[in-house]
Amino acid sequence: MTNAPVFGADVLARVADTLETRLPQNGGDPQTSYAAKLLAKGPDAFLKKIGEEATELVMAAKDGRPERIVSETADLWFHCLVTLAHYNLRPEDVLAELARREGLSGLEEKARRPAD
């Protein structure tokens, strides 16, 4: 769908860097930043947005509309990055986990998880 190369890890890291500046303890201003507003409200606010965006992604995928799928995925990922920032995590943590799982079958990976 895109013609230009996008370096995903770089983009994710830059967004994460920006989100860190939006954290309340780093002076994020809820009056001037949507992310700062979500972060100031706390987990209930951004977790609700994750649920909404996930539902919108499901609907876009059911409709088979590639441009909407990409747009809704971007919205979902953004709100996931907000969540990571709140918990002092980085996209690199998620990428490392994906790399760890790479090459494993999903069933094998699931079997290796500790029981809850």
Curated annotation (Swiss-Prot):
It is found in: Cytoplasm. GO terms for cellular component: cytoplasm. The keyword Cytoplasm applies. The keyword DNA repair does not apply. It is an enzyme of class 3 (hydrolase). Its EC number is 3.6.1.31. GO terms for biological process: L-histidine biosynthetic process. Keywords: Amino-acid biosynthesis, ATP-binding, Cytoplasm, Histidine biosynthesis, Hydrolase, Nucleotide-binding. Its main location: cytoplasm. Pfam families: PRA-PH (PF01503). InterPro entries: HisE, PRib-ATP_PPHydrolase-like. Pathway: Amino-acid biosynthesis; L-histidine biosynthesis; L-histidine from 5-phospho-alpha-D-ribose 1-diphosphate: step 2/9. It catalyses: 1-(5-phospho-beta-D-ribosyl)-ATP + H2O = 1-(5-phospho-beta-D-ribosyl)-5'-AMP + diphosphate + H(+). One of its GO terms (molecular function) is ATP binding. It comes from the Bacteria. Gene3D superfamilies: MazG-like (1.10.287.1080). Belongs to the PRA-PH family. NCBIfam families: histidine_hisI, PRK00400.1-3. This is Phosphoribosyl-ATP pyrophosphatase. It comes from Bordetella avium (strain 197N). The gene is hisE.
